[in-house]
Amino acid sequence: MSEIYLVGGAVRDILLEREPHDKDYVVVGSNVEEMLARGFKQVGKDFPVFLDENGEEYALARKERKIGDSHTDFEFIFDPSVTLQEDLLRRDFTCNALAREIETDEVIDYVGGKRDIHAKLLRAVRPETFVEDPLRVFRAARFAAQLNFDVEPLTKRLCWKMAQEGMLKHLSAERVWKELEKALQPNYASEKFMEFLLEIHALDDWFPEFIDLANAKEQKKFHWSENSFKHTMIALRRVRDYSSKVKFAVLCHDLGKGNTPVDILPKHIGHDIRGLALIDALCDRLKAPNEYRDFAKTFCKNHMRCHKMGQMKLAKQYDLVRCLSDNFKDKELLDDFLTCAYADTFGEEVPSEFNDDSRFFELCNRMRKIFDIMHGVNLQTFDERTQQMLMRHSGEDFGKVYTETKIRYLKNKLGEW
């Protein structure tokens, strides 16, 4: 008679008192015909996975054997003789190799997963098979971020060995990007992803820009961090609760410091512009979605302007808000930018034009007020006399006069707030 167990990340999350994102089940002692007869719908080509009426996944217990160099080159054995223990032993980390009885809620642990969860450690289940899939290096980095765990020394060395042997370069861009994107989810300790890869020298193939960033020294009068990589990681901690798009922008905002010309060091003048090409190269390599690329470039290009908001005249503030809100159409875009600006400015205790958080938030509120006033403003906003004056102009002259008119309108409205 077949038996069904809850397995993997769902069991781990329950032990961590977290709500499981997905629930996966393994069926021991069954076969395809029996599962279909019980009303399950079969999906998947390499090995049988079944969906119940609620869309939850059930997989036949299976063993696997590496038969080639590709991540798809595995032979799967999924007959009724495969045991629960054999199925769990093929998994990557001990915290993911747990099962739970459906009826009794008893947790079955063959590999010390509960111990490692308590100790907040990522440990390879079987070192000899762990190295068969180099993606596990990035999965280790991702789970370190997702769970806020540390990688135990032997597993760390296995990851280092795979990186040094050049195994990571054979991975697909889509698989690497997926792990980074998962590591950047809200409430994750996202900085641990890059910190782990830097520690084990695993950045060369997919993230070389961050090696250069780690070698970029900071000026103490701007950042107390030893180098730009450390500053970026501290800034990432500031946006721990925010979206992956915001985190990616913070991650990339100082990449231009990594290739500062030697003759202008220790200053990093122009790093905001130099960083744009580096973001393009990174996103091309990872095949990152355009929404990540576009926002990261917007923040990189404009993040130095944040530090000067307090000294800007109204026309400059108007232009900045217009640029950061898609011509006063998208307030969420502006809010995301200001969140990134806060992370950069207060990523550590640094001298700045702002004496405290309140000064920064005061200026942010001003930016939002400018948006609220200008959102929806068009020719019909103005009185007939002003419209007639504007219509006497054309081409570039019209654009200049129209902008001046809107700034005067903004100045008057700000005086009413």
Question: What are these language model-derived features?
Answer:
Residues M1-W417:
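Catalytic cores of the polymerase beta-like nucleotidyltransferase superfamily
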